[in-house]
């Protein structure tokens, strides 16, 4: 898998994967209204691409997922806005590969932060498996953090 800055010519594919991935959450406890804001919006994904936050995950020339990432002003903290993998690639290790690439994409990152809905047992287990520690929770989300070496 390669992780690279998203290309405008691939936006429609990236949006389709985002929609399919978040729509598949209905199978792990989501209500129909549980997807993140703008997960199916082409305009929003173009904005994220233009601001340098949208990445595409590629395997053998095929886009299989994406990530929305934000680097703090300190240059040492990365916030994972969201990651998504085509449901066809679920349970094949591709999400794990994507997160490992996210963790090394920006040089100098020492801490990664993210959040995920409490109802989503799949993502909560996934981030714990990757070594993320829950640092806080509220009524809707669990907040995770990982210190990098």
Predicted regions and their residues:
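Conserved beta-strand in the GNAT
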Residues: 56, 62-71, 77-79, 84
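A short beta-loop-alpha structural element at the N-terminal edge
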Residues: 2-16
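Conserved active-site alpha-helix within GNAT-family acetyltransferase domains
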Residues: 96-97, 118-137
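Conserved GNAT-fold acetyl-CoA-binding loop/helix
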Residues: 19-44
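Conserved beta-strand-loop-alpha-helix junction that forms the acyl-donor binding cleft
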Residues: 90, 113-124, 140-142
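Conserved GNAT acetyl-CoA-binding A-motif
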Residues: 99, 105-118
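Conserved acetyl-CoA pyrophosphate-binding loop and the N-cap/start of the following alpha-helix
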Residues: 89, 93-101
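A short helix-loop-beta-strand connector motif used in the catalytic cores of GNAT acetyltransferases and
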Residues: 42-56
């Amino acid at each position: 898998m390669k992780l690279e800055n998203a290309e405008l010519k691939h936006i429609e594919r990236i949006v389709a994967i985002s929609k399919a991935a978040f729509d598949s959450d209905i199978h792990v406890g989501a209500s129909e209204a549980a997807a993140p804001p703008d997960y199916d919006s082409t305009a929003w994904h173009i904005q994220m691409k233009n601001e340098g936050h949208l990445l595409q995950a590629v395997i053998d020339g095929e886009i299989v997922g994406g990530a929305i990432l934000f680097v703090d002003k300190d240059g040492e903290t990365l916030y994972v806005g969201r990651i998504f993998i085509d449901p066809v690639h679920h349970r094949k290790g591709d999400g794990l590969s994507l997160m490992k690439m996210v963790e090394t994409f920006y040089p100098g990152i020492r801490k990664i932060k993210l959040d995920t809905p409490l109802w989503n047992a799949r993502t909560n287990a996934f981030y714990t498996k990757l070594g993320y520690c829950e640092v806080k929770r509220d009524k809707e989300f669990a907040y995770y953090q990982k210190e990098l070496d």
